[in-house]
């Protein structure tokens, strides 16, 4: 791509989810509530996993990083989105837009591969339980988390640099509630054909690689479960993977709908609704999915709440 690093646009205007005045206040309250639940849920999950020694296992190590990623990419999008409901003209500076796009891509791609790492962890736990502690050593776990972070950062940096080296010399209204690649390309007066190919290629590669790991892991897991003769053993194995399967289905289903459909079928309004789901709703759902279906997390949460309540009682009595 031979575009010169010159832009006639110093800021963008985010159109937001809706421009209907009667929906602004209800939407603000709804998304504020969702964001608060997201922050409390993910932060709470991270804290509980860190402080409870019973949860210092590979599965919860990955889960704490998933909660961190959900918290980060929701925070990169939701606060700015809510501004659109309380101001008439929601502007974002050129460089802030680049930063938001970079953060969003980094954490979204990281989540793809973290879910794959978690699927591999479940595969080892069910298919090779006797070798679990060796195969999922601390060093291996750190590598399975570090690689997604480093890879996603490099890919996000690459895409962000290319997108913001394009020339923006005309309209600056982004038909979206955050800075995303496709809506930005619609505003560029440069040739965006190569960039569109790169988006499709990288999105396809990331989803095919990560989903292949997930799918292969679960095929082996299902085969192992079918070989278990006792009903109780099968239930225990299924409960171990149930939460992760739900989270994977929701996340990948939304991304496939968003990025791997033909260009002729793309509607920015439809994409906007899909984006709301995976940038706002999924980060809220994940801690609920993993905690409500997990006895160990529920027990640890109850223990932490009881301990906090006892501490408050002691503080009150000491006054």
UniProtKB/Swiss-Prot annotation:
Belongs to the G-protein coupled receptor 1 family. Residues 47-54, 121-133, 218-237, 293-319 are cytoplasmic. Coiled coil: none annotated. This is Olfactory receptor 8U3. Disulfide bonds join 97-189. PROSITE patterns: G_PROTEIN_RECEP_F1_1, G_PROTEIN_RECEP_F1_2. Pfam families: 7tm_4 (PF13853). Keywords: Cell membrane, Disulfide bond, G-protein coupled receptor, Glycoprotein, Membrane, Olfaction, Receptor, Sensory transduction, Transducer, Transmembrane, Transmembrane helix. Residues 1-25, 76-99, 155-196, 259-271 are extracellular. The lineage of its organism: Eukaryota, Metazoa, Chordata, Craniata, Vertebrata. The chain crosses the membrane at residues 26-46, 55-75, 100-120, 134-154, 197-217, 238-258, 272-292. It comes from Mus musculus (Mouse). GO terms for cellular component: plasma membrane. One of its GO terms (molecular function) is G protein-coupled receptor activity.
């Amino acid at each position: 791509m031979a575009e010169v690093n010159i832009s006639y646009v110093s800021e963008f205007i985010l159109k937001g989810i809706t421009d209907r005045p009667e929906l602004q206040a209800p939407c603000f309250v709804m998304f504020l509530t969702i964001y608060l639940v997201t922050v409390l849920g993910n932060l709470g999950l991270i804290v509980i996993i860190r402080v409870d020694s019973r949860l210092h296992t590979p599965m919860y190590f990955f889960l704490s990083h998933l909660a961190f990623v959900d918290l980060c990419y929701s925070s990169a999008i939701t606060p700015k989105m809510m501004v659109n409901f309380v101001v008439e003209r929601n502007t974002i500076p050129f460089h802030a837009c680049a930063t938001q796009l970079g953060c969003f891509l980094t954490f979204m791609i990281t989540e793809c591969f973290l879910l794959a790492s978690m699927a591999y962890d479940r595969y080892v736990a069910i298919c090779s339980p006797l070798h679990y502690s060796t195969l999922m050593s601390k060093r291996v776990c750190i590598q399975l988390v570090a690689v997604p972070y480093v890879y996603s950062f490099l890919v996000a940096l690459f895409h962000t640099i290319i997108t913001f080296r394009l020339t923006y010399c005309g309209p600056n209204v982004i038909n979206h509630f955050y800075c995303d690649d496709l809506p930005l390309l619609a505003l560029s007066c440069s040739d965006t054909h190569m960039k569109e190919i790169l988006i499709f290629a990288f999105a396809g590669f990331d989803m095919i690689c990560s989903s292949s790991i997930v799918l292969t892991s679960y095929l082996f897991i299902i085969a192992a479960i079918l070989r278990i003769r006792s009903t109780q053993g099968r239930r225990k194995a299924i409960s171990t993977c149930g939460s992760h399967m739900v989270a994977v289905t929701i996340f990948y289903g939304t991304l496939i709908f968003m990025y791997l459909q033909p260009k002729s079928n793309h509607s920015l309004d439809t994409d906007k609704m899909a984006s709301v789901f995976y940038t706002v709703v999924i980060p809220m759902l994940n801690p609920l999915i993993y905690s409500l279906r997990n006895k160990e997390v529920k027990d640890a949460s109850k223990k932490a709440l009881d301990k906090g309540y006892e501490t408050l009682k002691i503080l009150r009595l000491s006054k």
